[in-house]
């Protein structure tokens, strides 16, 4: 989860989020090197009056600043495309959960079970217990098994929403009349918080998401108690 004054990403809890963190570091290194080079050239231009008389006809320089940016873009694009394909790949999911966005709450349906569905509303600040998080706790958590591929089907009943859980690397738009899908696999148990990430009206800030990732045995016990 996030911490006050946190500057970086949340701790990765899924293979996809780990890949995104590596890609972020890879891209940031390239951007830092380019920025340093540009600042160095600007500082040289400001601190010296020397000029190159052949700048208007420098074929070698033009060749370099054409080929070098192309190579840099390829170094950024290839890992990005790899992660995009990984995010879209869903092979034989162990569980499918349908998520519907409403103004202003979420509803969930476990499609592999005959009658397992519920609504998830934010708990008002006045009803919170000691230690619970303001604007992030819900009355019904989404309980899922860890270390298994899970498919999320995401849509909306009314306006645009966005179902996002940062520590799992998930952010999928909930669009009325359209069914989007995402996949998640948690590498460890715990509570993972998210929020609606698309402005959807006056109570947009009050649509938290809470995933409770548990071992498979605990999930089976929970699902049996809910049926």
From Swiss-Prot:
Binding site for Cu cation A1: 161, 196, 200, 207
First and last residue of the signal peptide: none
Mitochondrial matrix-facing ranges: 46-59
Pfam families, alphabetized: COX2, COX2_TM
Keywords: Copper, Electron transport, Magnesium, Membrane, Metal-binding, Mitochondrion, Mitochondrion inner membrane, Respiratory chain, Translocase, Transmembrane, Transmembrane helix, Transport
Family listed: Belongs to the cytochrome c oxidase subunit 2 family.
Translocase found in the keyword field: yes
Location relative to the cell: Mitochondrion inner membrane
Protein name as annotated: Cytochrome c oxidase subunit 2
Transmembrane segments: 15-45, 60-87
Organism of this sequence: Tamias merriami
């Amino acid at each position: 989860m996030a911490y006050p004054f946190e500057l970086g990403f949340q701790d990765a809890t899924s293979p996809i989020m780990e890949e995104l963190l590596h890609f972020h570091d890879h891209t940031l290194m390239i951007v830092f090197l380019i920025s340093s080079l540009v600042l160095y050239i600007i500082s040289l231009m400001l601190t010296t009056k020397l000029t190159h008389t052949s700048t208007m006809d420098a074929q070698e320089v033009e060749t370099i600043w054409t080929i070098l940016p192309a190579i840099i873009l390829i170094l950024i694009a290839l890992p990005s495309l790899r992660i995009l394909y990984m995010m879209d790949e869903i092979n034989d999911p162990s569980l499918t959960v349908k998520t519907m966005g409403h103004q202003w709450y979420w509803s969930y349906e476990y499609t592999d079970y005959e009658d397992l569905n519920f609504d998830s509303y934010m708990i008002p600040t006045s009803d919170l217990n000691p230690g619970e998080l303001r604007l992030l706790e819900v009355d019904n958590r989404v309980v899922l098994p860890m270390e298994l591929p899970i498919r999320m089907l995401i849509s909306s009943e009314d306006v645009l929403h966005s179902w996002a859980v940062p520590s799992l690397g998930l952010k999928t738009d909930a669009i009325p009349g359209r069914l989007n899908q995402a996949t998640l696999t948690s590498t460890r148990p715990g509570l993972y918080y998210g929020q609606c990430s698309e402005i959807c009206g006056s109570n947009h800030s009050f649509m938290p998401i809470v995933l409770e990732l548990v071992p498979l045995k605990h999930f089976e016990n929970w699902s049996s108690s809910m049926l």
